[in-house]
Amino acid sequence: MWNQKHDLESAQTPLYPMMSESPELRWSFIRKVYSIISIQLLVTIAVAATVVKVHSISVFFTTTTAGFALYILLILTPLIVMCPLYYYHQKHPVNYLLLGIFTVALAFAVGLTCAFTSGKVILESVILTAVVVISLTLYTFWAAKRGHDFNFLGPFLFGAVIVLMVFSFIQILFPLGKISVMIYGCLASIIFCGYIVYDTDNLIKRHSYDEYIWAAVSLYLDVINLFLSLLTLLRAVDS
């Protein structure tokens, strides 16, 4: 009985000062978003583990022309699907269908990246990602409760991602060596840590209740990009 009363009082406590909406509704929305993200991460782990374990899959992608073409398609698919996903993210069941395609395609790309990485580096990246994501999420909820706002990070993070994209393009055309890869991985990790805080703050304060798919996509991308950034950094250190 005491626990039920305590939970009810916790649910009625505002998540941030001057909160005008119902805390129960916002908490329900937050739980729904994190449930979707959890399913996405489980699908990603299952698909990526299959790609890593079944050696013939990575061999097909790296040694055949059809495999290379399919790899390019898998890389482009999440980018292509994000356009209709943004447009239909409030339209059920199309939003879930597009989300599934987006998640599976990205999971394949993650799996192929992990297929050429040592198990130790993958494990280190997974542990670091989990610790950082949980820590930053708890911090953002704590900071929001005390009136801190992280909306100002948006323009800076967007500009930083543009710099990363240009740096990646240069790296493809003119490989800059191990040190440059380490610097890239370190900077990318910091940037996506910022995005986790920024998108969690949006989840708490700004997303409408119908934007659960887009909120989940944003945080899922933050987690995956942080993992890949740490993987890049640790792989360069390990080489």
UniProtKB/Swiss-Prot annotation:
Membrane topology: Multi-pass membrane protein
Record has Phosphoprotein as a keyword: no
Entry comment describing in which tissues the protein is expressed: Expressed in seedlings, roots, leaves, inflorescences and flowers.
Any one GO biological process: defense response
Domain of life: Eukaryota
Similarity section: Belongs to the BI1 family.
UniProt protein name: Protein LIFEGUARD 2
